[in-house]
Amino acid sequence: MYDNMSTMVYIKEDKLEKLTQDEIISKTKQVIQGLEALKNEHNSILQSLLETLKCLKKDDESNLVEEKSNMIRKSLEMLELGLSEAQVMMALSNHLNAVESEKQKLRAQVRRLCQENQWLRDELANTQQKLQKSEQSVAQLEEEKKHLEFMNQLKKYDDDISPSEDKDTDSTKEPLDDLFPNDEDDPGQGIQQQHSSAAAAAQQGGYEIPARLRTLHNLVIQYASQGRYEVAVPLCKQALEDLEKTSGHDHPDVATMLNILALVYRDQNKYKDAANLLNDALAIREKTLGKDHPAVAATLNNLAVLYGKRGKYKEAEPLCKRALEIREKVLGKDHPDVAKQLNNLALLCQNQGKYEEVEYYYQRALEIYQTKLGPDDPNVAKTKNNLASCYLKQGKFKQAETLYKEILTRAHEREFGSVDDENKPIWMHAEEREECKGKQKDGTSFGEYGGWYKACKVDSPTVTTTLKNLGALYRRQGKFEAAETLEEAAMRSRKQGLDNVHKQRVAEVLNDPENMEKRRSRESLNVDVVKYESGPDGGEEVSMSVEWNGGVSGRASFCGKRQQQQWPGRRHR
């Protein structure tokens, strides 16, 4: 029996090598059950033999029973050993399962740690890049700080430059000045608002732009003027994000920041993005400041200008009218800022062919400027020139001629005193030369009839354009000698003005190359205004620059070519 059992065990051991773990566990359980049964059976037999042994006397038969009992005991010991080994195998199997499970958990953890390690490496690389960019930005800001400190030291020098050059410098800043309610935007009209009156308008609304935003605004001007939009845009976005975290979205400072970012987008010709930001800013300002606040008027005007740039004059007109209503209500109907808004509205109507309304708005603006700023204010000449261009488009040549002559006469009187027989404006010299053509020699000096213009420094770009337009009008009337006189005066004055500007800028470069480079960058950036031909002062902003070629249709032209009526955003040099 024992031999057979051993054989079975060996057979089982041979088969174990080919069994799976689950099969081994199952077979082991069966073996345990079999061994338990054998153990119980052997115990029963042993008990029976022991009972029999008690009843027998000591003889040969009792010895046989005792020998059988000993064999049964040995078998029980082997069964106990087999059971113990089987239980050890079961415990070992459970342990192996636990180890395998733990191994799988550790493998999953290793994979997760590898992924986290890779993520941390990527984050570290990104952080290092951001740190490098931040260090570069810090270095740039340090340079910008030094530059601004230097510019502040030159403030007295800047205050001493000519009035017309001041206007040109202001015009280069205008695209970003419109973001604040104290300089409500009018790119394209070029009617600059004085800071004192603008600040008063802002205070009337009970909201004042924080100094930190003005500093940021100036910094954005510098970056945008250099074409460094990759710096200006993130700077605006970061400031906007910080403001929204600290003050919430519906806060006037957030609206101001939205306006700044909108203008940067506008300079990049991203008109759709700019319009979305301006609409958001408008909603915030109406909610926080009220619908009749000057800042609301500024935002409405900015939005109207933006629509105008996209050719959406019909959509822009009601916005411009609402801005006009607010300014009339807050500032009064005869305030210069109202005239500025009237100029914008006139330009929108002119692009839609509403000439009666254009005349009304320009005439009203002209009356305000003459009353409040005086007849010698540059805005008076500019508005007259705009009104004259409107007359030209309608074929009202006589009215346009009258306005052109008024501009030239006033410019002459401002420089040389009242007009008399010995002191005549250039258009009178031109008409006299036309009447006396053939009698006057070709070698007549320019100074005899046009030298007065060389000293005209007040608003020479407007005068230059007026000379050209009146010359074109003379040419249409067949007054070729008079036309040539005015055109020659304009050409020579322009050349002299450019020479003066060149000399001045050479001197500036020698004194401060960095400042001059910055000035050039600002001038090249300013695509948001339309300028007349540049004069000695570098040019002044106006709502439109129109030269008429004297054709029968009365079409506007520039340098003999057809010029489209432009919304502010294009510049003629």
From Swiss-Prot:
Q: List the Pfam families.
A: TPR_10, TPR_12
Q: Which InterPro entries match?
A: Kinesin_light, Kinesin_light_repeat, TPR-like_helical_dom_sf, TPR_rpt
- Tell me where it mainly resides: other
Tissue/organ expression? Found in a variety of tissues. Mostly abundant in brain and spine.
UniProt-annotated stretches for the region Disordered: 155-203, 553-573
In the record, the effect of residue 460 to A is given as: Abolished phosphorylation, leading to increased interaction with CLSTN1
Which parts of the chain are TPR repeats?
213-246, 255-288, 297-330, 339-372, 381-414, 464-497
Q: Phosphotyrosine is carried by which residues?
A: 449
The Gene Ontology biological process terms listed for this entry are: cell adhesion; microtubule-based movement; stress granule disassembly
> Bias regions of kind Basic and acidic residues — which residues?
155-176
Its family remark reads:
Belongs to the kinesin light chain family.
Q: How does it assemble?
A: Oligomeric complex composed of two heavy chains and two light chains. Interacts with SPAG9. Interacts with ATCAY; may link mitochondria to KLC1 and regulate mitochondria localization into neuron projections. Interacts (via TPR repeats) with TOR1A; the interaction associates TOR1A with the kinesin oligomeric complex. Interacts with BORCS5. Interacts with MAPK8IP3/JIP3 and NTRK2/TRKB; interaction with NTRK2/TRKB is mediated by MAPK8IP3/JIP3. Interacts with CLSTN1; phosphorylation at Ser-460 inhibits interaction with CLSTN1.
Provide the function of this protein: Kinesin is a microtubule-associated force-producing protein that may play a role in organelle transport. The light chain may function in coupling of cargo to the heavy chain or in the modulation of its ATPase activity.
Please report the name of this protein according to its UniProt entry.
Answer: Kinesin light chain 1
Task: State which gene encodes it.
Answer: KLC1
